[in-house]
Structure formats: structure tokens, C-alpha cells
């Protein structure tokens, strides 16, 4: 039994070996044919590769031309951008300003604005410094400071005073009404404060909150004052023009009258030119002379002759 079993196993192993050899032979045969097929395929693939390489080279040339055109376009765009840089900077600045204005306008719509009145401005304080001081209480939208009169400025500088600009009064608009009220309550009658060595530390401000007063009312008032001032100026100019015209007319009329008088005096002198000469009495022997004259002359001659003889 044991031997049979061994025989069976040996037969099976042998048969398996034979099958493996046959399979290997078949594979070798197939590999041989597959090489030929691969040669054919390789030949075809080489031809196709040569054909396929041509469009790739054409694509490369086209891509190079497109790259050159793109580089030229980029250079022209850079040149145009270099020319248009200042314009773009101005546009950018303007757009920032517009955005700030729009933001403040939106905040105004959300909140009710408040206006404070500054009856006294510290000497030589500029609007930027005033805005900085008031901004501690809230965001400020608009600020207006009225300059001193030109006559006062000239008088002050003529007397040896400081030539810097001074402001007399001002108005400030807060975006929030409560900030304006807080500013008026805090700063009115108090020192400005801040750093102890600052120029405006000990200056006192007079700040008053204007209830129910808007910036439009201030602009209307200023426009009204400007209109009144302009009307007065135009009236004064028209009056001065009338006076000048009247004066010129009077001067011309006086010159004309003087010329007329001179001409008349000259004509009168020419007409009244009568000359008087001292003449001796003349005796005549004319026929139409009276006989007394004729006899008188004869008697005078006789008298002369008698005196001589």
C-alpha cells in the first residue's frame, strides 16, 4: 500500500512536470511569435512617432510665436502702465477720499449729528490741532474756524506782534450727538490739558452745545452773511463809481467853460482894439471948410509977417 501510494505520488509529480515543460514550450513559442509581432508593432510605432513628432514640433513653434507675442504685449502694457501710473495714483487717492466720505455719510444716517460752538480759540492754534483735541471725545466730521480780520492782523503785526494766523471762533460737527454733548460738558471753562509741557496745556476753551442746530444751518448763515457782505460791497462800489463819474463830468465841464471864457475874452479883445493918438489942430484950405477957419489962417500969417517986419 505504501508502495502504491508512493507510485501514485510519483506519477502525479511526473505528470505535473511534463505539463510544466509543455507549458514552458508553448510560452517560448508564443514569445518567439510575440517578438516578431513586437517588431512589426515597433516598426509601426516608429513611423507613427515620426509622424506624431511633426505636429509636436509645429506646436512648439506656434507656442514660441505665441510666447513672443505675449511678451511684446506685456512690454506694451508695462509701458502704458508706466505712463498711466500718476493717473492711477490720483484715482486711487480720489477713491479713498470718496470711500471716507461715503463711510461718514453712512454714519451720519445711522446717528444724529451734533454741533458745538467755540467762542474762543487759543492763540495761533491751527485747525488740525483743534481737531486732534476734540477727537478725544468722538469722531468729528467737519470743523470750521473763522480767521481774524485782515485789519486786525495788520494792526497787530505793525505793532510788532506775531505774524502767525489767529482764529477768533469756530464750529465743530460730531457724528454722534452724545459725543458733542460730552465735549461741551467736559471742555467748557476748563483747561485743555494733555502733556504738562505742551504749548496749549493751560489754555481755557469756551465750548457750547447747540441743540437743534445742524451744519446746514451754519452754511446757510455763512452764505447769508457772505451775500450781505457782497451786496454791501457792490453798493459801495456802485456809489464810488457814481461819485467818480460825477467828479469826472464836473472836471470836464469846468475845463470846457474855462476854454469858452478864454475864447470869448480873446474875441472881445480883438473887437475892442481902439487906439487913441494925440493930434494937433489942423487948419484946412479946403473948399468945404468953414470960412472962420480960412480967415483965421490968413490973419495968423499976416500977424507973423507984421511981427517980422
UniProtKB/Swiss-Prot annotation:
- A cellular component annotation (GO) from this entry: nucleolus
Give a yes or no for keyword Repeat in this entry. Answer: no
Matching entries from Gene3D superfamilies are given as: 3.30.70.330
Which residues are in the RRM domain? 114-204
Listed GO MF terms: ATPase activator activity; RNA binding
Which residue stretches does the UniProt record annotate as biased composition, category Basic and acidic residues?
A: 88-98, 265-275
Answer yes or no on keyword ATP-binding.
no
Q: Cross-referenced CDD domains, in alphabetical order?
A: RRM_ABT1_like
The record's keywords, sorted A to Z, are:
Nucleus, Ribosome biogenesis, RNA-binding, rRNA processing
List compositional bias (Polar residues) regions by residue number.
68-80
Q: Name where it mostly resides.
A: nucleus
- Which processes are annotated in GO (biological process)? endonucleolytic cleavage in 5'-ETS of tricistronic rRNA transcript (SSU-rRNA, 5.8S rRNA, LSU-rRNA); endonucleolytic cleavage in ITS1 to separate SSU-rRNA from 5.8S rRNA and LSU-rRNA from tricistronic rRNA transcript (SSU-rRNA, 5.8S rRNA, LSU-rRNA); endonucleolytic cleavage to generate mature 5'-end of SSU-rRNA from (SSU-rRNA, 5.8S rRNA, LSU-rRNA); small-subunit processome assembly
Location comes to: Nucleus, Nucleolus
Q: Which InterPro entries match?
A: ABT1/Esf2, ABT1/ESF2_RRM, Nucleotide-bd_a/b_plait_sf, RBD_domain_sf
Q: Which family does it belong to?
A: Belongs to the ESF2/ABP1 family.
List the protein's name: Pre-rRNA-processing protein ESF2
Q: Which organism is it from?
A: Candida glabrata (strain ATCC 2001 / BCRC 20586 / JCM 3761 / NBRC 0622 / NRRL Y-65 / CBS 138) (Yeast)
Please spell out the taxonomic lineage of the organism that makes this protein: Eukaryota, Fungi, Dikarya, Ascomycota, Saccharomycotina
The gene it comes from is ESF2
Amino acid at each position: 500500500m505504501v508502495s502504491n501510494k508512493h507510485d501514485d505520488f510519483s506519477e502525479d509529480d511526473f505528470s505535473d512536470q511534463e505539463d510544466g515543460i509543455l507549458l514552458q514550450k508553448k510560452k517560448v513559442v508564443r514569445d518567439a511569435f510575440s517578438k516578431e509581432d513586437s517588431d512589426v508593432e515597433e516598426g509601426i510605432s516608429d513611423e507613427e512617432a515620426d509622424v506624431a513628432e511633426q505636429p509636436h514640433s509645429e506646436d512648439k513653434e506656434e507656442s514660441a510665436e505665441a510666447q513672443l507675442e505675449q511678451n511684446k504685449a506685456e512690454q506694451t502694457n508695462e509701458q502704458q502702465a508706466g505712463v498711466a501710473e500718476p493717473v492711477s495714483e490720483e484715482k486711487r487717492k480720489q477713491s479713498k477720499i470718496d470711500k471716507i466720505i461715503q463711510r461718514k455719510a453712512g454714519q451720519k444716517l445711522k446717528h444724529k449729528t451734533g454741533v458745538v460752538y467755540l467762542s474762543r480759540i487759543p492763540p495761533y492754534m491751527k485747525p488740525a490741532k483743534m481737531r486732534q483735541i476734540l477727537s478725544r471725545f468722538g469722531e468729528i466730521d467737519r470743523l470750521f474756524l473763522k480767521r481774524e480780520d485782515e485789519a486786525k492782523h495788520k494792526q497787530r503785526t505793525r505793532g510788532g506782534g506775531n505774524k502767525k494766523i489767529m482764529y477768533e471762533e469756530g464750529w465743530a460737527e460730531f457724528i454722534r450727538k452724545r459725543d458733542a454733548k460730552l465735549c461741551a460738558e467736559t471742555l467748557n471753562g476748563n483747561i485743555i490739558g494733555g502733556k504738562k509741557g505742551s504749548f496749549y496745556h493751560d489754555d481755557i476753551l469756551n465750548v457750547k452745545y447747540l441743540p437743534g442746530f445742524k451744519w446746514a444751518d451754519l452754511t446757510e448763515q455763512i452764505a447769508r452773511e457772505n451775500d450781505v457782505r457782497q451786496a454791501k460791497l457792490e453798493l459801495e462800489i456802485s456809489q464810488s463809481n457814481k461819485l467818480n463819474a460825477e467828479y469826472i463830468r464836473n472836471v470836464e465841464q469846468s475845463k470846457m467853460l474855462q476854454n469858452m471864457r478864454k475864447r470869448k475874452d480873446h474875441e472881445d479883445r480883438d473887437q475892442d482894439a481902439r487906439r487913441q493918438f494925440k493930434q494937433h489942430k489942423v487948419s484946412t484950405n479946403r473948399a468945404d471948410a468953414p470960412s472962420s477957419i480960412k480967415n483965421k489962417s490968413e490973419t495968423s500969417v499976416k500977424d507973423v509977417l507984421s511981427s517980422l517986419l
